[in-house]
UniProtKB/Swiss-Prot annotation:
Ranges of residues in domain BRCT: 321-414
Start and end residues of each stretch annotated as Disordered: 428-471, 489-560
HAMAP family for the chain: Pescadillo (MF_03028)
Compositional bias (Basic residues): 544-553
Family in the record: Belongs to the pescadillo family.
Name assigned to this protein: Pescadillo homolog
UniProt record, GO biological process: maturation of 5.8S rRNA from tricistronic rRNA transcript (SSU-rRNA, 5.8S rRNA, LSU-rRNA); maturation of LSU-rRNA from tricistronic rRNA transcript (SSU-rRNA, 5.8S rRNA, LSU-rRNA)
Length: 631
């Protein structure tokens, strides 16, 4: 039997370097990257790098050998090889100025078809929905880009069309569940076929060119090339699930014979589709309530009243109320407010919305409509206001959706300081730090209170002393006023003016009070005797206070942690270290957040103190002026 040589079996044969993979596939580096992105093949990290690299200590990019064998049978490899031949032939035609032949070759440009790759990577529709988060986020980002060297205009337009179609589905199915505004953009989460899909819609900022060292647009463009095919398949399936015509179309009643539709019907329809403010054409007449069947309550009742079933019932009831949250309300969006995110919010929950017709086509009613209930404004004041509507800031809509109820509009009026905008994506089970506002939202009795430091307690004592001094000053003033009144009474009425009958009555009252006091003292003495007898019968001893030594407690915790680390098996030590590191980073983040919160509370407290001092100063000055005027 032949003895196997070193690196002929085991981990050395499981991995292959990138250079060897390129040589095996006969592709260039750019084509190899493109193929790996489209097929979902990515580098691997071996357990023992030196063994995987056949004794070499140099750090190389490694792939699984079976993944490279898998790429050998891909039909796209032949298309990528055809690109080389196509480039050589077209360059030759340009050199000899054979433009007739060049035109013929350009018409036969080899195109890559990715349909079979999408079906291969996502065997079921649910698998595609699970991987839709990154897809939507990247498509929304590319839909805002202008025409660049590596991003053609057609690609940006395609991203814009696919994202608008997906938003139409979200509005029609009323599947939006959570929203949040952050520095990155607008976070949205929809529930589609039981899967939670989260994406980011970027803010409307002017495009800033980036260097190649910061952002590689070529690699991102390859991802977008695959994601556009995936999103097209997904939109087609979602639209047909709701009996909506795909591509999106409008009913014939909307396409009236006016000048706009007569000039260019295609641009008219595309503008109205982008407005997100009109119902789409359906293949059959199905009511909106029948689109997404709710959970069968009768079926749940058969399973008993377990905690899980009760929770599912409550969630189903909340979702049914949430889908009609803005029903019966009419909103008007001011010019300075971003239109698209708010239109998605309002229409997803049953509301009606419009805006200024000069901002974007698709407005359904004007600003002077008396039936408008809310106007969304993001400026400190307005010149003209209507009494019949509430003027609110955009955050009100997001907070209403996250709390699943219509909140009072008092805190969101023009010029008001907005309440904190809480994230709905916080998991109370996983996240250690929860803001006190969120705790108070769920349970008012769980408002977070941090332990006061010595400085804070000293400040509180100083405040109390100031208040006591003010109170003493006020009492002294009242005492002085009382003395002045009594002096005036003696001056005009005199103490001799008191009747003798009244003096007799007062003496009789004093005698009665003395008798009552004697009786009360006897009762108190009897009660104390009884208590003393009861105490003698009881055998309760006084307890001792044990002081906790913090140093010993900390030492015991450290020893326990070391013992726990020793008990971990050698193969699980890296995992144990990773878990401990994650725990430490979480604790550090929590400590930093609590520290920031304490600083914010201290600043607000100091501001309130300064306001109080200013108010006292103004009151003292006003009192001094009044005293001068009286004199």
């Amino acid at each position: 039997m032949r003895r196997p040589k070193k690196y002929e079996a085991g981990e050395a044969t499981q991995y292959i370097s990138r250079r060897a993979a390129i040589r095996k596939l006969q592709l260039s580096l750019n084509d190899f990257r493109r193929l790996c992105i489209l097929k979902g093949v990515y580098p691997r990290e071996p357990k023992h790098r030196r063994r995987a690299q056949k004794g070499s200590s140099e750090i190389k990019i490694l792939y699984h050998t079976k993944d490279i064998r898998f790429l050998l049978h891909e039909s796209i490899v032949w298309t990528l090889r055809d690109y080389k031949i196509f480039a050589k032939k077209t360059s030759r035609d340009r050199a000899i100025k054979d433009f007739r032949n060049l035109k013929r070759r350009l018409a036969l440009f080899p195109e890559i078809k990715l349909d079979h790759i999408v079906k291969e990577r996502y065997p079921t529709f649910i698998d595609a929905l699970k991987d839709l988060d990154d897809c939507l986020t990247l498509l929304f980002l590319f839909s805002t880009f202008p025409s660049l060297h590596l991003i053609p205009r057609e690609q940006s337009n395609l991203c814009r069309r696919l994202t608008i179609e997906f938003l139409h589905y979200v509005i029609a199915s009323k599947s939006l569940r959570k929203v949040f505004i952050s520095i990155k953009g607008y976070y949205f989460q929809a529930e589609i076929k039981g899967q939670k899909v989260t994406w980011i819609m970027p803010h409307y900022y002017p495009f800033k060119p980036q260097s190649r060292q910061e952002v590689d647009f070529k690699v991102m463009s390859i991802f977008v090339e695959f994601y556009t095919i995936l999103q097209g398949f997904t939109n087609f399936r979602l639209f047909h699930g709701l009996n909506l015509a795909y591509p999106p179309q409008f009913p014939s009643s909307l396409l009236q014979d006016n000048e706009d539709t007569f000039k260019d019907e295609a641009s008219f329809v595309s503008d109205r589709i982008a407005a997100l403010n009109f119902e789409l054409l359906r293949t059959d007449k199905v009511q909106e309530d029948e689109e997404e069947p709710d959970i069968d309550m009768e079926l749940l009742e058969q399973d008993g009243d377990s905690k899980r079933i009760i929770k599912m019932k409550q969630e189903a009831q909340e979702v049914s109320r949430l889908r009609t949250l803005f029903k019966g309300l009419k909103f008007f969006i001011n010019r300075e407010v971003p239109r698209e995110p708010l239109v998605i919010l309002i229409r997803s929950f049953g509301g009606k919305v419009s805006w200024d017709a000069s901002v974007f086509p698709g407005a359904t009613f004007a600003e002077n409509d008396e039936t408008i209930t809310h106007q969304i404004v993001d400026r400190p004041s307005l010149s003209t206001q209507y009494i019949s509507r509430d003027y609110i800031q955009p955050q009100w809509l997001f907070d209403c959706v996250n709390q699943r109820q219509l909140l009072p509009t008092n805190d969101y009026f023009l010029g008001e300081t907005l309440p904190p905008h809480l994230s709905p994506f916080v998991d109370s089970k996983r996240d250690s730090y929860i803001p006190p506002e969120e705790k108070a939202l769920h349970d008012p009795s769980l408002i977070e209170t941090h332990e006061q430091s010595e400085e804070e307690s000293e400040e509180d004592e100083a405040e109390k002393e100031e208040e006591e001094a003010d109170q003493e000053l006020l009492d002294a003033q009242l005492q002085l006023a009382y003395q002045q009144e009594t002096a005036e009474y003696k001056k005009y009425g005199g103490p001799d003016g008191v009747n003798e009958d009244e003096e007799d009555l007062s003496e009789e009252d004093d005698e009665e009070d003395d008798d009552e006091e004697d009786v009360d003292k006897e009762d108190v003495d009897e009660q104390t005797k009884r208590k003393q007898q009861e105490k003698e019968k009881m055998s309760v001893q006084s307890g001792k206070v044990h002081k906790v030594n913090k140093r010993q407690v900390h030492k015991a915790e450290v020893d326990e942690h070391r013992l726990q680390a020793r008990m971990v098996k050698p193969r699980h030590r890296n995992l144990f270290r990773k878990l401990i590191r994650e725990k430490q980073t979480k604790e550090k983040e929590e400590w930093l957040l609590r520290k920031k919160r304490r600083n914010i509370d201290a600043d607000t407290k100091e501001a309130k103190k300064a306001a109080k001092r200013e108010a006292r100063k103004l009151a003292a000055e006003a009192a001094a002026r009044a005293a001068k005027l009286v004199k």
